[in-house]
């Protein structure tokens, strides 16, 4: 048996070395690899005064086509600063830039983050070293999940996603070490609890949407410590409450961010998902005029100024939105259902990942780096949508099964490391998904829910690895772990199968189409034939796109045209899992006679192949009078 333990320990160390190799290969590559800035990196730049080394007029703009390697010190912009634990890592790069004449290669920032990851992995390995199966599971997660390019491409950036992944990784590992200790009737080591609290603070302050995530992770630990260390448990609960209060109420947020998020959630997600938008708007305290902007987002205001059509939504409190969702749970469920297909984009192809190459994605990264850059993200993104729907539904089943197992075992005073790990991972994933949609609607939902991808991947790794626990040790505990893993697999598959059937039926009935009308750009137009152009997608496929006017005129659009974004990029980069995405453009023309009365209400309707009709745009067109 000691010989077997030594072999397992060596394998675990080798896996950590493999993960380190994968990380270093990506962050040190030439040309530089990292996700390009679609604008949000500007918020961390504003905090620390570190900007892309481009013309001054270009520094504040988005550069989503490709990442920029060189950064320079510049002015801080406190009013635009997004306070996050990401600033801690960025500050190191700023200090090095100060030493080297004010410029720094962003790979230096990547090296700082990689060092933090490796030190954390080695410390956690030492913590788990007395439990070979735990050490091996942790090493597998580090090598396969943390070392996956879909995660390591965040290192050479100023995005907040890295700090979320880093602190979630450490927090969940420490949760298992604390709450699944062998003797639950003895206190957890105080130093371990303090480190756990620090990691929870780092996680809670990584992104505003994670203000309650530390509470989800900390509750099992606090419960397990309740009897032998009541004061430590209370202290942990005080910490997570303080995180929520500070993040939600104390840290300043730029008014533009608040307004944009409100528009994307209320107008872009909640009202379109409601069966009675007028009643929902009334419950939110919005005037009926706001219904004219239903379906609008901050970036696509449907030809209007939202300050004039619906100023009330811009300053709406999140408390009012939360109260509405509690009052209309079916609306909340439809919001989640409508965003479900977009969660399959693990690849994030709309963010270029290679310096000086336009929208180069995972395949191009692998061509630069080789085997260390093999990623699960393209594989998941390319899955048949029905299979992805089943797998994601199964993760929800796994969350329910693991939560029940945790409650049962903790009530009996038994250690439950597998159930705890699965609960924390799937719970964190679904927390990220829910808060992404109700935090910023469907705008970049796959990126805002990015934490879900590594958590679900890690849950799959832990679950499969646990099936082979008897190979690590022949004791009764390993056999129980294998049986428990098989039980979790069976339960999640059964629940996932049932839920995916319900989802498939619901998707046939609920309006699921997405799309944009990008012309006309203004709703005040000449009294002449008026062309509507844009794109439309639907999970079952688009059968037709129609313009419907308030005088009952119906104009069929020509659908199936090529479509390119504002920078000439393919729509597939944003919505890779939808059918017909390479020919999703449409064009329709309203005759001049339709504008004869001066004003005209026009709705753009997408007809799915299942027959469901979805409104994607509504406008009040006003003809100019000369």
Set out the residue ranges of the language-model regions.
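Membrane-interface alpha helices of multi-pass inner-membrane proteins
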Residues: 191-207, 219
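Transmembrane-helix motifs of polytopic, lipid-linked glycan transferases
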Residues: 111-132, 170
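Basic, ligand-binding patches in group-transfer machinery
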Residues: 491, 495-626
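Short hydrophobic/aromatic helix or loop-helix immediately within or flanking a transmembrane segment
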Residues: 63-103, 110
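Membrane-proximal stem/loop segments at transmembrane-domain junctions that anchor or position
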Residues: 43-78, 252-364
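Specific aromatic-rich, kink-prone transmembrane helix
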Residues: 163-183, 200
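Membrane-interface anchor segments at the N-terminal boundary of transmembrane helices
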Residues: 100-118, 339-425
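Perimembrane helix-loop-helix junctions
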Residues: 2-5, 213-241
